[in-house]
């Protein structure tokens, strides 16, 4: 196989890996944490993964503390936690 063919194959494999959904066994443990607004009083619309409903949901984050199950976009939440 030529070097160009190998590069194409490598590129396709990389793309396939990026587009393959994360399975529940590969999901980071913090995806199981409950939503946590934290003690601060900000009003940031963010997303968390709800493991009971197997989906990303919006919640209001106060802006400090909380936990790692906190994403700025629904896309980031789905990419990280949703199967």
Swiss-Prot record:
All disulfide bonds of the chain are 40-64, 56-77
Q: Where is this site: Reactive bond for trypsin?
A: 41-42
Q: Extract the GO molecular function terms from the UniProt entry.
A: serine-type endopeptidase inhibitor activity
The UniProt keywords, alphabetically, are: Disulfide bond, Protease inhibitor, Secreted, Serine protease inhibitor, Signal
For this UniProt entry, which residues form the secretion signal? 1-24
Where in the body, by tissue, does this protein show up? Expressed by the venom gland.
Q: Which GO terms describe its cellular component?
A: extracellular space
Protein location: Secreted
Question: Main localization of the protein?
Answer: secreted
Q: Answer whether the UniProt record assigns the keyword Glycoprotein to this protein.
A: no
BPTI/Kunitz inhibitor domain spans which residues?
A: 31-81
Q: Does the keyword Disulfide bond apply?
A: yes
Q: Family assignment?
A: Belongs to the venom Kunitz-type family.
Query: What is its biological role?
Result: Serine protease inhibitor.
Name used for this protein in its record: Kunitz-type serine protease inhibitor nigrescinin-1
> What organism is this sequence from?
Cryptophis nigrescens
| Taxonomic lineage of the native organism | Eukaryota, Metazoa, Chordata, Craniata, Vertebrata
């Amino acid at each position: 196989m030529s070097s160009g063919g190998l590069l194409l194959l490598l590129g396709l494999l990389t793309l396939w890996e990026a587009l393959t959904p994360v399975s529940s066994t590969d999901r980071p443990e913090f995806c199981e944490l409950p939503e946590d607004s934290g003690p601060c009083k900000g009003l940031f619309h963010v997303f968390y993964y709800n493991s009971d409903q197997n989906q990303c949901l919006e919640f209001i984050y106060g802006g400090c503390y909380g936990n790692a199950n906190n994403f700025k976009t629904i896309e980031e939440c789905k990419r990280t936690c949703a199967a």
